[in-house]
Amino acid sequence: MKQLYILFLVVLFAHKGSAQVTNLITAKVINAKGIPLEFANVKVIETNQYATTDKNGLFKISGLQSNTNINIEISYIGFQTSRIPVTIKTGENNLGNISLKILDLSLEGIEINAKRNYSGATNSSLIITRELIEQTPALSINDLLNQIPNRKIQPPSLQKVQNLNLRAAYAPTTTGKGDFELSNAFGIAIIMDGNNITNNANMQSYNPGRSLGQGNSFVESGSYGIRGTGDTKNAYTGDFTFGGTDLRQIPADNIESIEVIAGIAPAKYGDLTDGAVIIERQAGKSPTYVRMQLRDNATSYGFSKGFELSPKFGAVNFGINYVNSFQDNRDKLKAYKRVNTNAMWSNTFGKYKQLKNTFSVDYGRNLDGIKHDPDDEKSTRTRFDSWNFSVSNRSNYRFNSGFLKNVSLNLRYAEGHQVSYTEQLVNEPYILYTTATTTGVHEGTYDTGVYTAKSLIDGRPINSAVNLDFTGGFKTGNIAHYISFGTGFSYSANNGLGQTIDPNEPRSGTKVATTTIGATSSERFYDFRLAVAQKDLGLYIEDVFTANVLGKPLNVRAGIRSDIQNGYASISPRTNINYEVSKNLRFGLAYGLGYKSPGLAQRFPGPTFYEIPLLNAYNGKVNESTYLVYVERYEPTNVGLKPSKSESIELSAQLKIDKFNLSLTAFNKKSTRGISTVQNLQSIVLPTYTATLVPGAKPVVNQTGVRPYAINYFTFKNDLSSDNQGFEVILNSPEIKEIKTSFNVSGGLFKTSYGSTSNTLSSKVPNTIPTDPNYAFIGVYEPRNSKAYFSNGRLTSITHIPKLSLVVQFIAEFDLLNKTISTESSRIPIGYYNSVNEYIAITNFDKANPSYGHLYITPEEQKENDLPRVIANYHFSIAKEIKKRFKFAFNVYNAFNHQPYYITASGTYQYPNSSPTFGAELSIKL
């Protein structure tokens, strides 16, 4: 990091005193009353050059090439952002006065829907502007992402982890912890103010090497909720290890814009496979905003203010947000509380204000958990608490001449503390346990079976990153090239206490059952500080230019990226090309590769312990009893764990007819080397014992022979793959002036063929052990191979009456298709393990065979999902502004309480629509 900072300073001073400025662009930024706007932000999109207006509203940008076309974006908090195309002429280019309009409901033509019109960094970028954000009462950024086409609208709630999936359809899970859901979410980068909010250092889980793998390794609650209502909840977890960043932690109040890249990201962005969400927050001088949102299940309060320190010391923008929400207001057992505060100091330096610097400090705290339910006989308590702190600095230096146009240095350090805790009462005659941590036969311990089982996972993730980026420009003939190149380094570690598990008081599921003496995977203490810090390095170069082909502009963004992740090097070519046939028709083509580094929890999951009881000679007196147990310690290395990979190709088009705007995108994305846990079944031969009880002394133990036992554990491998195809469509209509109403139609269709490379195992142990020595206990099936289809569409009407400062929005949403298909062969075993753990292959499966016929899986058991009909849902919102200072908004999800249901093939009831939820928001601008 030190070397990159020195390089930044060297480049900066090396260009001081260079050739005189030849081309200059200048303008004055004012409001509707002609008053100059100080601290307005100005950005040249192509060269990444920044400027800030002075007290007279003036800005100047030099070093632009003659006869080139650029776009200047001018923004000011509380005003509508303006984007102006400019053709640079030799000498001074004075744009005169640029008037920004105050952003309120009296403004004509405000954006209420996200747009996809080639204005972002990629062909398929979906832009969510501040205009839309202000009209969307949101508890978190997840509510704003409901604008993504072919995504089912989620009601405003903070009662479960919010992970984002892009361009994929998988068999739905109730927890969102399916292997493919986690892999897709983990591959989506959340970029805030130029920094990747990574989840690489998150290690909050039990040992994933235990039974059932990563998706079942989270701290979970018991059942909770009001009994007898049919809506009892179960197995909640607030952890989001192995997946993406929990979007609940990101408030929406101070966000200026969001760019959702579901396709091929620019080469600048690394450590991703499935897209990126680029968030820019408000910085600079602004009015005072006070917001209060009251919902049926939550209350939210927000305050923000940007004020000028002085013309010399710049401006500071400060914000704070508090949310208190419940799963059910009637019992308030399940609660989520969040407080976020941030401060951003912005200033420009130098005689010509060429250096712009933004320094940010953020702090957030989350209290998530379930209190003791009086109806729970186990007195279960669960909590998932955390705090996070980050400090970052973004510097941009604008050059007035020469090849280099801009250099930027981004630094960030983030640290947090995560606590996942659960406790429950255990009431049994006695328990068996061992604290041994080495492989071999050990004498275990008898202890009381009445205690409180406690599990605490303590994590302290640390993430730091440095990014150095350059933008340059040159011409080849009549073509202006804008070259961006740079490097980035990221560091992730976890200094938490780790899995502070006490084997003396094992929780349910990890203790040896005293009645059956069955084998189990047990738990031990694991210190997260033993995990070696993750260090990833990336380099990139990219060229952006426009060429004339047949007299029409061909816009090209082409680059290449190289990363070193977990010791593996990768090359990622990426390109976004679009051809402007006319002002009303444009076609696009994009192609690229992406790689996502494995996280610390996948690289260093910790040792797995498997216990096989060999003898339990117990007569009710500990001093006269003996417990022998075999402990197997497995140390996963995961040295060969490679970064996951995706390869995408995308076609896009935009058509404008009579003010109708149609955007269409089709894609094919192939994801390979997805990381998941794979079940390993091994056989080991161990001694058998008998014991003769001796009054007043330990039993006499004799070895009588040997027998095979099964050892079962999970390891991380690059096991997942998926092939995704689909299309997305967005259609915007012009406003019908007579009724002041416009319409928006969006939707799509996704198909995903997904599977794994490893065989799957299924336990079929009967209640009564048969005498047949070849009876199948564990079935072996071919690797997972399924297809899923998903289609969602919506029709939105927006009535905007500027004279009344009123907006009314109605959404009709339709679930068109939601289907999962598994191959017939996946239900037929290819082999099995018998009682002595001997593998027997099956060549011609016979369902009538008494030894293995019970291994056949029926379609009902596979729980294939198939939406039998179109399911509709309806949402409504209204917003009214008074004197441009007070705004009242009201919104309802599932406005008509439409609760259709259907019965699945397995006989379970499915309710696709959530219960109605409503809320009101009051905002004040001073």
What are these language model-derived features?
Residues 439-553, 773-783, 809, 824-828, ...:
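Outer-membrane beta-barrel transmembrane domain signature of Gram-negative proteins
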Residues 28-33, 40-43, 73-79, 89-134:
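Short, acidic, small-residue-rich periplasmic hinge/interaction motif at the N-terminus
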Residues 41-43, 49-58, 109-138, 144, ...:
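N-terminal periplasmic "start-of-domain" segments of outer-membrane beta-barrel proteins
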Residues 142-230:
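Extracytoplasmic beta-strand/coil segments of soluble accessory domains associated
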Residues 670-673, 677, 814-836, 848-856, ...:
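C-terminal beta-signal and adjacent terminal beta-strands/loops
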